[in-house]
Swiss-Prot record:
Protein name, UniProt field: Ribosome maturation factor RimM
Free-text note on domains in this protein's UniProt record: The PRC barrel domain binds ribosomal protein uS19.
Keyword Membrane: no
Subcellular location(s) of the protein: Cytoplasm
Alphabetical keyword list: Chaperone, Cytoplasm, Ribosome biogenesis, rRNA processing
GO CC field: cytoplasm; ribosome
Gene that this sequence comes from: rimM
Classification via InterPro entries: PRC-brl_dom, PRC_barrel-like_sf, RimM, RimM_N, RimM_N_sf, Transl_B-barrel_sf
Single GO BP term: rRNA processing
Organism the protein comes from: Orientia tsutsugamushi (strain Ikeda)
Matching PANTHER family: RIBOSOME MATURATION FACTOR RIMM (PTHR33692:SF1)
TM stretches of this protein: none
C-alpha cells in the first residue's frame, strides 16, 4: 500500500446518542473538533458523511448521512474513522505525528540501534510507546521528553527510566 493510500485512524464512533440516529464520536485530533475538517472513511474506505455536529463536553455529537434511527446508529458503534495519510497537514520540522513513529528505530545514548517502536497507545493519561528490543523483549514507556529526548524521522533516542 502506498503512503498516498495509507489510512490513519483519527477517531471512533463510541455510541449512539438519542433516538434520532445521532452518534457520539471520540476524536483523536487536537483539537477534537478538527476531525470535522476531513472526509472520514471506515476500514473499507466507505465515506462516513457528517451532516451536522455539536460538541458536548468531550464528545462530538453527529448526524451521519442516511442514519436516522437509534437502531441504525447502534450498528455503527465502535466504527473506526480514518483519513488518508496525505490529507494530514504538513508540520514544521520540529513537530511530528505520533502515528509516524510506528516501526522506526530506537537508539540508546551511544547511538546503537537497540530496537524499534512496535506500538503507540493512548489510555487517556498520555501516549505510551511500546519498544521491541533486538532480543525480542517488549517494554512500554510513557512518551515523555525525559525518556525520548531525541526524535527524528528515522529514529528515536531512548533513556529508559532506570537511567534517568
Amino acid at each position: 500500500m502506498s503512503s498516498e493510500s495509507k489510512l490513519i485512524l483519527i477517531g471512533i464512533i463510541s455510541s449512539p446518542y438519542g433516538i434520532r440516529g445521532q452518534v457520539a464520536i471520540k476524536s483523536f485530533t487536537d483539537p477534537a473538533s478538527n476531525i470535522l475538517n476531513y472526509e472520514l472513511k471506515d476500514y473499507r474506505k466507505n465515506i462516513i458523511k457528517i451532516h451536522s455536529a455539536k460538541i458536548l463536553s468531550k464528545k462530538i455529537i453527529c448526524n451521519i448521512d442516511q442514519i436516522v434511527t437509534r437502531t441504525a446508529a447502534e450498528q455503527l458503534t465502535r466504527t473506526k474513522l480514518y483519513i488518508y495519510k496525505h490529507e494530514l497537514p504538513q508540520l514544521p520540522d520540529s513537530e511530528y505525528y505520533v502515528a509516524n513513529l510506528n516501526g522506526i528505530k530506537v537508539k540508546n545514548l551511544e547511538g546503537e540501534i537497540i530496537g524499534k517502536i512496535n506500538n503507540i497507545c493512548n489510555y487517556n493519561a498520555g501516549d505510551i510507546i511500546e519498544v521491541v528490543y533486538n532480543d525480542g523483549k517488549k517494554i512500554m514507556y510513557p512518551f515523555t521528553n525525559e525518556i525520548f529526548p531525541q526524535i527524528t524521522e528515522d529514529f528515536v533516542v531512548i533513556v529508559p527510566p532506570e537511567f534517568i
